[in-house]
Amino acid sequence: MNTLNVKLSHSISQLYETLCQVGKSTFADLQRATNFKDTELCLALCSLMHDNKVYQARISNTVYYIIK
């Protein structure tokens, strides 16, 4: 596994743990909690959504990410 895949895998795990702790969160909330840059957070969120671990919901014009 190359370095990029290892880093992304670690980011995905860290993001999942963060979401489990804080519950539903906005993109900005997750950035503050993880200190991820936009691209890193997007890739980790996409991976978790692809694996059906997280879903995206619009509540009162705000997009939230929520553990399934």
Language-model features: locations:
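Alpha-helix N-cap/helix-initiation sites
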Residues: 5-8, 23, 38, 56
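Short alpha-helical segments that sit at the start of domains
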Residues: 1-15, 42, 62-64, 68
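A short, conserved structural fragment
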Residues: 49-59
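Residue-level detection of the helix-turn-helix DNA-binding "recognition helix"
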Residues: 20, 46, 50
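Aromatic side chains
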Residues: 16, 27, 55, 64-65
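Long, compositionally biased intrinsically disordered regions
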Residues: 1-3, 29-34, 60
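Short amphipathic alpha-helical interface segments
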Residues: 8-34
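Short amphipathic alpha-helical interaction segments
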Residues: 36-47
